[in-house]
UniProtKB/Swiss-Prot annotation:
GO terms for molecular function: DNA-binding transcription factor activity, RNA polymerase II-specific; RNA polymerase II transcription regulatory region sequence-specific DNA binding; zinc ion binding. Residues 180-213, 573-678, 694-728 are annotated as: Disordered. Belongs to the CTCF zinc-finger protein family. It comes from Gallus gallus. This is Transcriptional repressor CTCF.
Length: 728
């Protein structure tokens, strides 16, 4: 009974297919074309016949010696089983999954073979059958002797629309694109004799591809992606929803479609940070806030991420999970390990400057180096005009304001603001307690062995691309030799001014000197309108006039206690100071002449003149005090004497004092008055300076400053006047 039912079904299907063939030939004569991307013809030796259904969109192979049950999966057409039609646009992505069926093995989980949204003009019903029945029919055919084991029976050919791509996905996820030529068989000249044979039409692809990743355990799955981009022709295109071919199997897992294109990046709205993942952006945004939700239960310190907290906990426990493969060292974080290997083992410098030959291990150092080209100093001191290229130097500078000295000598407990200063102190003051490592190539003595390795690598390693001397054309392949050669140019005044006779050793000094000719003052004060030629002058101006916390430095002479605002001025004073109030020199008031004094005098005449003018001002004040304390008296005619010679005045270096002070001292007349003591009868000589007639304003000021002196009627001195003079 089953055989008769199968034969009836086959006859009906053959009748249906022949009717479709006639319609196909008629449409071909009218000049119509089919949309066909792949056509695989069977082998003529198998006695197969090509049967094609254009309206249904299904093309298959009929074989004379094939069991009818095997053909039921593709040929049986049930009337009345037409699925619902839905309109589909040509932009929808169509997917067909192809799997290899091996009839010799046991039943396996093949999933299902499903045709999805194949656009054709007419809807065609498709019946379903199980793969187990297909396998059973194949075994029966083999047992009857009709087929040999391993002989192929079925050849499926499906019409694929224009604009598709066939992709083969392996078991490990690798993707292989199959070209159109690989899908088509080699042409057989015998096929041209077949009246039903029609060569496939060549279509151009539009190069719009989509990848499908779909794998099963231990199997290779071929995935075809349909991407329709055909232009709409006249008329409406309907959609065929194909029924399930294998209904008893579970559907495969959904396939992820990953399209080609530019990778999406996420940008921070507060800075220039970009990243490929949203999670990285969310983690970065926490750096702009004070939120630190992850707290250490041992010390209470909080962190933004769990990773930072985990690394911090490793510092408490002493865990170092990241071990160096080249040595015995281990580190808390992977970044520390990478930095260690680059510094100690690989010597790799991946971050290179595009403007010069500089290369660095860390990206932060490269950014700092690039600022040396651009001149950018983004880190500004809030207390003065200092600006730095990196935060490290700014922190070091801030210690000059706060007075912090974090580095302590472990021998004498002296404290320093910089680690380099502390190391130099240890080498100079405590060399007996420090291990010394001598460089085998030069006279350098280094305290630590690791520093010796750095010295050998940087100073004495061979450089393939030689470095040129910046003063001449000499080229050296060793950094130490280059430095020693450049020292030979140290005392050469190679830079000469083209407008005067000035010459200097460094180029920056020549740049500053030329500003004296051009009048350029590039350094402007941010708080006032003053401009300066040098940065040091701007800093001095800012501290003196705009810094409320600035306290001028006082340089005190250790001999007489006099203070100066400049160190060099105090040094010149100390050379001639004898420790007395008068400030006379050690050689009886004579200035100390020497090489040091002559050099300083020739070096800065302007400073000497300004200092002499400042030093002359106290002399003027002293003279004014003497004038105020002088008493107006008339010399007695009976007793007269010549005024004694004035004491030797202090000789000052530099220009002579002002003319006003000299004239004041020389124009002061003096007189000697002999006074007899009433009790003892002794006569004392009193030297009195006679003051000239002052102006009216001066007289008023003196009258306000001191009480009026009462004179005797005859002009003689009263006892009160004499006592007041003796007291003074």
């Amino acid at each position: 009974m089953e055989g008769e039912a199968v034969e009836a079904i086959v006859e009906e299907s053959e009748t249906f297919i022949k009717g479709k063939e006639r319609k196909t030939y008629q449409r071909r004569r009218e000049g119509g074309q089919e949309d066909e991307a792949c056509h695989i013809a069977p082998n003529q030796a198998d006695g197969g016949e090509v049967v094609q259904d254009v309206n249904s969109g299904v093309q298959m192979v009929m074989m004379e010696h094939l069991d009818p049950t095997l053909l039921q999966m593709k040929t049986e057409v049930m009337e009345g089983a037409v699925p619902q039609e839905t309109e589909a646009t040509v932009d929808d992505t169509q997917i067909i999954t192809l799997q290899v069926v091996n009839m010799e093995e046991q039943p396996i989980n093949l999933g299902e073979l499903q045709l999805v949204q194949v656009p054709v003009p007419v809807t065609v019903p498709v019946a379903t059958t199980s793969v187990e029945e297909l396998q059973g029919a194949y075994e029966n055919e083999v047992s009857k002797g009709g087929l040999q084991e391993g002989e192929p029976m079925i050849c499926h050919t499906l019409p694929l629309p224009e604009g598709f791509q066939v992709v083969k996905v392996g078991a490990n996820g690798e993707v292989e694109t199959l070209e159109q030529g690989e899908l088509q068989p080699q042409e057989d000249p015998n096929w041209q004799k077949d009246p039903d044979y029609q060569p496939p039409a060549k279509k151009t692809k539009k190069n719009k591809k989509s990848k499908l990743r779909y794998t099963e355990e231990g199997k290779d799955v071929d995935v075809s992606v349909y991407d329709f981009e055909e232009e709409q022709q006249e008329g409406l295109l309907s959609e065929v929803n194909a029924e399930k071919v294998v209904g008893n199997m579970k559907p495969p897992k959904p396939t992820k479609i990953k399209k080609k294109g530019v990778k999406k990046t996420f940008q921070c709205e507060l800075c220039s940070y970009t990243c490929p993942r949203r999670s990285n952006l969310d983690r970065h945004m926490k750096s702009h806030t004070d939120e630190r939700p992850h707290k250490c239960h041992l010390c209470g310190r909080a962190f933004r991420t769990v990773t930072l907290l985990r690394n911090h906990l490793n510092t408490h426990t002493g865990t170092r999970p990241h071990k160096c493969p080249d040595c015995d060292m281990a580190f808390v974080t992977s970044g520390e390990l990478v930095r260690h290997r680059r510094y100690k083992h690989t010597h790799e410098k991946p971050f290179k400057c595009s403007m010069c030959d500089y290369a660095s291990v860390e990206v932060s150092k490269l950014k700092r180096h690039i600022r040396s080209h651009t001149g950018e100093r983004p880190f500004q001191c809030s207390l003065c005009s200092y600006a730095s290229r990196d935060t490290y130097k700014l922190k070091r500078h801030m210690r000059t304001h706060s007075g912090e000295k974090p580095y302590e000598c472990y021998i004498c407990h002296a404290r320093f603001t910089q680690s380099g200063t502390m190391k130099m102190h240890i080498l100079q003051k405590h060399t007996e307690n420090v291990a010394k490592f001598h460089c085998p190539h030069c006279d350098t003595v280094i305290a630590r062995k690791s520093d010796l390795g750095v010295h050998l690598r940087k100073q004495h390693s061979y450089i393939e691309q030689g470095k040129k001397c910046r003063y001449c054309d000499a080229v050296f392949h060793e950094r130490y030799a280059l430095i020693q050669h450049q020292k030979s140019h140290k005392n050469e005044k190679r830079f000469k001014c083209d407008q005067c006779d000035y010459a200097c050793r460094q180029e920056r000094h020549m740049v500053m000197h030329k500003r004296t000719h051009t009048g350029e003052k590039p350094y402007a004060c941010s708080h006032c309108d003053k401009t300066f030629r040098q940065k040091q002058l701007l800093d001095m101006h800012f501290k003196r006039y705009h810094d409320p916390n600035f306290v001028p430095a006082a340089f005190v002479c250790s001999k007489c206690g006099k203070t100066f605002t400049r160190r060099n001025t105090m040094a010149r004073h100390a050379d001639n100071c004898s420790g007395l109030d008068g400030g006379e020199g050690e050689n009886g008031g004579e200035t100390k002449k020497g090489k040091r004094g002559r050099k300083r005098k020739m070096r800065s005449k302007k400073e000497d003149s300004s200092d002499s003018e400042e030093n002359a001002e106290p002399d003027l004040d002293d003279n004014e005090d003497e004038e105020e304390t002088a008493v107006e008296i008339e010399a007695e005619p009976e007793v007269s004497a010549e005024a004694p010679a004035p004491p030797p005045s202090k000789k000052r270096r530099g220009r002579p004092p002002g003319k006003a002070a000299t004239q004041t001292k020389q124009s002061q007349p003096a007189a000697i008055i002999q006074v007899e003591d009433q009790n003892t009868g002794e006569i004392e000589n009193i030297i009195v300076e006679v003051k000239k007639e002052p102006d009216a304003e001066t007289v008023e000021e003196e009258e306000e400053a001191q009480p009026a002196v009462v004179e005797a009627p005859n002009g003689d001195l009263t006892p009160e006047m004499i006592l007041s003079m003796m007291d003074r």
